Amino acid sequence: GSEMCIRDRFDLERAWNLPLPSAPVRVKECASCRFWALCEQELVAADDISLFLPGDRAKPFRERGITTVQALIDAHLGEPSRLAAAWRAGEVLLRRGGVHVPRADIEVDVDMEAYLDQGAYLWGAWHDGEYFPFVTWEPLGGRAEAENFAAFWRWLMDLRAQAHAEGKTFAAYCYSAHGENHWMRMSAQRFGEVDELEVEEFIASSEWVDMFAHVKSSFAGPYGLGLKVVAPEAGFAWPEEDFDGEESVNARREALAGDHNARQRLLDYNCGDVQATRAVREWMDAGAPGTTAL
């Protein structure tokens, strides 16, 4: 006990004795801080490197004495310097070289919406110019979710089997497959309506394509490579802007209570996501016009 007290006191004394930072540094939390407008002026005046690389991301450069965005640009350190220059110029995407994306005769775009860690209530798909939503507004974890996932899975596998039967190639696409893979596996495990091995086989196959992986290998960008960043570069606009994660959680709660407007918003947004994924693919297939080489 006493040993802990001594160590704690030492840590506290060391913290007290550290010099207080005399200037702001941008971190992730700045986005929701009411003092950001004040700090931003100071950071912009100083051309602080944290404007481009927030938090610890700037640490290796600060240790080399590079503390401003311009210094990073002038250091000619390859990609970091090139991205800093792109950030300064407002360039969203830089091409890494050849842009590659797999195509198929029969293509489906998929986007899943889950509610917290309770389950997946919406599996949306875009195929042949049409939106197919598989959705339940019932509480999750029961028959309604089980039947909804099974209906989506049967539809997708039937489309795939039909393509194979006609000697055509098939591919289903999503943007960052982590969530979809998790809930496909979980749904098969929890409900037993869909064969787990069939799910694993599909996830591992070349017919399940993560567009995000192809975007990452084709581009670099100072603002990240999320769908909301990349799709506008491909000329796509969502029907409703900034419907963020928190808003969709609230809308889901309202939808569960029977709010038809909330239900339609969730469907419209999901429909936008699957169309955005398709737009990015077609734009990449055309060589990503409008982007600059890295």
Regions found by a protein language model. Give the residues of each.
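Flexible loop/turn segments at secondary-structure boundaries
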Residues: 115-118, 141-142, 179-183, 190-191, ...
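Acidic, Mg2+-coordinating catalytic module of metal-dependent nucleases/exonucleases
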Residues: 8-46, 230-294
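Short, small-residue-biased leader/transition segments that mark boundaries at the very start
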Residues: 1-6
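Activity-critical C-terminal alpha-helical subdomain
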Residues: 190-242
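Conserved RNase H-like, two-metal-ion catalytic cores of nucleic-acid enzymes
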Residues: 95-166, 190
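Short glycine-rich phosphate-binding loop at a beta-alpha junction
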Residues: 167-178
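N-terminal accessory regions of nucleic-acid-interacting proteins
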Residues: 48-104
